[in-house]
């Protein structure tokens, strides 16, 4: 019996070795290389973000007349604050002169809280706030580095400043007695910025832009509180706004995988 067991064990060991020798050798394959993407600015996008802004306002006090007569020298005041923004646009990227250029059009809307205490006339003080702005325009730029667009922008813009209630600067403080209405100013803007493709999520871009806006002067008629009766005086106001904005944008046609050439 012992001899039979030993014989069977030896036979099993020999058979296993023979079968293993007949099997193909195990092959090892490398993990697939990560896919590289070539970002493209051709297509449309949406985005949102925020920023910080400053505004300067030139105010001149007039007697309405006739004839209309300037009462005071022009004074300059200003405010500052934060804002949120949303944007949508479309771009087109094309090769030229050994690099790539981008042209596009866009529109954006800012939810603002840029405010300051102002004294546009002698003896009166109140708080003024730029509460919103919108812009439509275009941009042109070049792909300075792979995935990096440097651009300039410009176009038309409007900004809304809320109603200002003016009270006496004398002590003790008195309730407001006059005001000038909410006003929308019209103007133009110029800007410059960079936009960078975030490779960890294809289609997602990050951009930062400085923008300067100048608005046409507008006449604000002073009115009494509470009746709103127009007074015989008014204020001409002209505004200049500086903003720095940073946004995340998603491009729907963001590019595709880089295909190796042999």
Where are these regions (language model features)?
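Gram-negative outer-membrane beta-barrel domains
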Residues: 2-262
């Amino acid at each position: 019996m012992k001899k039979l067991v030993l014989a069977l064990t030896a036979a099993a060991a020999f058979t296993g070795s023979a079968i293993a020798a007949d099997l193909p050798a195990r092959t090892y394959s490398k993990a697939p290389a990560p896919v590289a993407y070539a970002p493209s600015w051709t297509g449309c996008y949406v985005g949102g973000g925020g920023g910080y802004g400053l505004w300067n306002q030139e105010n001149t006090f007039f007697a309405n007349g006739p004839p209309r007569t300037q009462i005071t020298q022009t004074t300059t005041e200003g405010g500052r604050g934060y804002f949120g923004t949303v944007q949508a646009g479309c771009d087109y990227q094309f090769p030229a002169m050994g690099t790539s250029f981008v042209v596009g059009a866009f529109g954006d809307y800012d939810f603002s809280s840029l405010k300051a205490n102002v004294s546009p006339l002698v003896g009166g003080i109140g708080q003024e706030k730029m509460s919103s702005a919108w812009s439509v325009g275009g941009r042109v730029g070049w792909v300075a580095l792979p995935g990096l667009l440097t651009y300039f922008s410009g176009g038309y813009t409007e900004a809304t400043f809320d109603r200002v209630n003016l009270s006496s600067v004398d002590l003790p403080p008195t309730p407001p007695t006059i005001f000038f209405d909410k006003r929308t100013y019209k103007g133009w803007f110029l800007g410059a910025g960079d936009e960078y493709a975030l490779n960890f999520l294809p289609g997602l871009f990050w951009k930062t832009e400085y923008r300067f806006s100048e608005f046409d002067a507008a006449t604000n008629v002073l009115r009494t509180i509470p009746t709103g009766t127009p007074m015989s005086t008014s204020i001409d106001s002209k505004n200049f706004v500086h903003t720095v904005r940073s946004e995340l944008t998603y491009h729907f046609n963001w590019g595709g995988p880089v295909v190796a050439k042999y």
